[in-house]
Amino acid sequence: MKKYGCLVCGYVYDPAKGDPDHGIAPGTAFEDLPADWVCPLCGVSKDEFEPL
C-alpha cells in the first residue's frame, strides 16, 4: 500500500500505521479512508494528498 503526503503541511499517511488517534486502524489503505477524514495536522481534506 502506498503512503500519501499532505501537500499543505507535509504529513505522511502511512497505511501500515493508520491513524489510530482518529479511529483509523493499521492496514487501512488511503483509498479506504472515510470521505470525511482530514489531515490530523492541518485539517485539509483527502483531496490535498498525493501518492509518495
UniProtKB/Swiss-Prot annotation:
Give the note describing cofactor binding and stoichiometry.
Binds 1 Fe(3+) ion per subunit.
Species per Swiss-Prot/TrEMBL record: Heliobacterium mobile (Heliobacillus mobilis)
Q: Molecular function terms in GO for this entry?
A: electron transfer activity; iron ion binding
Alphabetically sorted, this entry's keywords are: Electron transport, Formylation, Iron, Metal-binding, Transport
Give a short account of its post-translational modification.
Answer: Observed in four forms, with and without iron, and with and without formylation at Met-1.
Q: What is this protein called?
A: Rubredoxin
Name the residues that bind Fe cation: 6, 9, 39, 42
In this protein, which residues make up the domain named Rubredoxin-like?
Answer: 1-52
